[in-house]
């Protein structure tokens, strides 16, 4: 980890990170994080009864548990704004909301109606404006006009699906769904699977998302703010997430190790100089501290922050290159999966930029109207 941050610091005058995802590999020593969190979230409907430590409340916006039988969101109401009457309701036509109408539940309903949650994304994805039923086309080909075409409503206790078809092309369907959600206090519950993955998610107020899988491996999607400047800010954000995450684990799992690790992590946040932060991170790796010793890069992107004032020559890019140009002038390096990958493509990017500058200078010095076609091809296509 320290070597990665050292290199990102070396190039931060030219490149800034955008997407940054990483994994914390499961360790036997820390126990069943997934199972214990699942048990706590499944049995409670108040945020305070899950997260006892009030010091970390401002950092955590929501907890989500999703498996085949149940999806449950527990929200921290204090992290949401007070809505006025003109606040846009996003999802009423997708959901039937059942609530006990208490003050706490009514506030949760208000938040759910206005937040673009994963439930909204899921139900929007499963609503299909047009879908071709190829099985029914086959019936038409082989069975003539007497083939049976389905349209109508299919439903269970929590999901209603309406299938409509055009009388002239009955194999083309329009599918719409409505989902029932039960809101009690801070909990938003629906039955059945509402995600591709079976995970527990911790959503932070800074938009970082931690996904915990059944084997307690974690996938962390580190958010980025517009005011993030350089590697030191990135380290502070990552270790701020670590600090609050590990205190949450200590809260739920009752494993004092996480409290010890949180204190070590806090030292990284407390020191101000980058060299001091990197020194502490290196020491954590040497002592096999959770969060550093089991850190594994998932994927990250870099963007070239300087302006490209010269002509861009796309022909210099390999077909499978991770160097991409967006909108003609924006250079990004995408889907980097290791430090070696990063060093390799930054080097290629630097060399390519120099080559483009040289070609651009030549191109600007010649008379395009009189120059030979072969010479122009050599500049533009090779």
UniProtKB/Swiss-Prot annotation:
- Record note on quaternary structure: Heterodimer of a 45 kDa and a 32 kDa subunit.
Q: Which organism is it from?
A: Ectromelia virus (strain Moscow)
What is the recorded name of this protein? Intermediate transcription factor 3 large subunit
Task: Tell me the protein family, please.
Answer: Belongs to the poxviruses A23 family.
Keywords of this entry: Activator, Transcription, Transcription regulation
Tell me which InterPro entries the record gives.
Answer: Poxvirus_intermed-TF
Is Zinc one of the keywords?
A: no
What the protein does comes down to: Acts with RNA polymerase to initiate transcription from intermediate gene promoters.
Question: In terms of domain of life, where is this protein from?
Answer: Viruses
Here the disulfide bonds are none
What Pfam families does the entry give?
Pox_int_trans (PF05718)
